[in-house]
Amino acid sequence: MTVAAIGYLRIQASDTDAWMNFGTAVLGLMESARQDAGGARFLRMDDHPFRFMIEAGEQDVLLATGLEYRSAAHWQAACAALEAAGHAVSPGSQEEAERRCVEAYASVSDPSGNTLELYHGRKLDYVPLNSPAGVKRFITRDERNGDMGFGHAVLPAPETGATIVFYTELIGLAVSDDLYPPIPDSRVIFMHADNPRQHSLALYNQPHPSGVVHIMVEVENLDEVGRALDRVKQAGLPLLATLGRHVNDNMCSFYVLAPGGIAVEYGYDGLQVDWERHTPTVSTEGDLWGHEYSFPGVND
């Protein structure tokens, strides 16, 4: 395994002001002061220069998922393995690498059409989080093992078998567990990077119009989750799922729809795993309790 963490997301928004207000006032992220020649805006949650790059466009979709490698050697090996397997790997320019605050990156698409940006050498500026909503800390680090990434993302993977092989044999992730939820023909494969977070990426075996099923950010306690839930209600935003706790990663969370419809899970108490002692599991139930799902326009 060579992927260290899921480092950032590039999100296209039809209303960047609304997305930035959601990110800061509701989620409690901090807007970066960075200026971007392409007009992108940035949300940060820790000492990284950004975790979410918000770019203007007609549709609300995930543009790319940034996966970090621990060294140039690991990154080069992954790129070489992908090319040898017949995947088109596109190195990014130095200018584009600087926009992402990385030493180097390359783009590749998985067999289900999701765009990845593989990179190494993230450039930190160590500006501390100053959350406009008063969030004290987002869980992005483990004191013993270092960076765990911003949280996790669940990507659509209708070409499920080939996409699993792509991530496990070429990209450098490993399967944490497998879920067959009580929904016809549904499956979710959870994958971890080389850090203790129970999953950094997951694959859902159906297509999704926004290019991402949901993204997750984690805070340090239940009170932070409760205060965020209050902010969601005050903002009049639709809940996708009520408060609940998952079976696999133990996350106590709720789900909210961001402006434009991308789902965000907001939780705490996520499981951290010693992978040398872990055996992947198969489940048929996703929640210990709660998480009553409501899909706007469907459950109305």
Residue ranges, per PLM feature:
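Core segments of cupin and vicinal oxygen chelate
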Residues: 1-4, 8-50, 155-198
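N-terminal beta-strand motif that seeds the catalytic metal site of vicinal oxygen chelate
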Residues: 1-17, 62-67, 130-161, 174, ...
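Vicinal oxygen chelate
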Residues: 5-14, 57-146, 187-192, 236-300, ...
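Catalytic cores of nucleotide-enabled group-transfer and carboxylate-activating enzymes in metabolic
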Residues: 6-32, 45-60, 69, 90, ...
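Conserved active-site tyrosine of GNAT-family acetyltransferases
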Residues: 19-24, 82, 113, 163, ...
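A short beta-turn/loop motif at secondary-structure boundaries
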Residues: 35, 57, 96-100, 181-183, ...
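Flexible internal linker/loop segments at domain or repeat junctions
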Residues: 189, 197-210
